[in-house]
């Protein structure tokens, strides 16, 4: 799994669908 700082830091994606995906899977599962 990717470092959480990537997803929770300043560069965290603001796309709500991606946030839902993250909360459901508990992992950074999207592609950049």
Curated annotation (Swiss-Prot):
Residues reported to bind chlorophyll a 2: 22
Cofactor note: Binds at least 14 chlorophylls (8 Chl-a and 6 Chl-b) and carotenoids such as lutein and neoxanthin.
Assembly and oligomerization: The LHC complex consists of chlorophyll a-b binding proteins.
Membrane topology, from the record: Multi-pass membrane protein
Family label: Belongs to the light-harvesting chlorophyll a/b-binding (LHC) protein family.
Organism: Populus euphratica (Euphrates poplar)
PTM text: Photoregulated by reversible phosphorylation of its threonine residues.
Compartmental location: Plastid, Chloroplast thylakoid membrane
UniProt entry tagged with the keyword Chloroplast: yes
Domain observations: The N-terminus of the protein extends into the stroma where it is involved with adhesion of granal membranes and post-translational modifications; both are believed to mediate the distribution of excitation energy between photosystems I and II.
Protein name stated in the entry: Chlorophyll a-b binding protein 2, chloroplastic
A biological process term (GO) from this entry: photosynthesis
Predominant localisation class: plastid
Any one Gene Ontology cellular component term annotated for this protein: photosystem I
Keyword presence, Kinase: no
Binding site for chlorophyll b: 24
Keywords, in A-Z order: Chlorophyll, Chloroplast, Chromophore, Magnesium, Membrane, Metal-binding, Phosphoprotein, Photosynthesis, Photosystem I, Photosystem II, Plastid, Thylakoid, Transmembrane
Record: residues binding chlorophyll a 1: 19
Record's function text: The light-harvesting complex (LHC) functions as a light receptor, it captures and delivers excitation energy to photosystems with which it is closely associated.
GO MF annotation list: chlorophyll binding; metal ion binding
């Amino acid at each position: 799994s990717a470092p959480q700082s990537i997803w929770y830091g300043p560069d965290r994606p603001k796309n709500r669908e991606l946030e839902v995906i993250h909360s459901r899977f508990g992992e950074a599962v999207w592609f950049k």
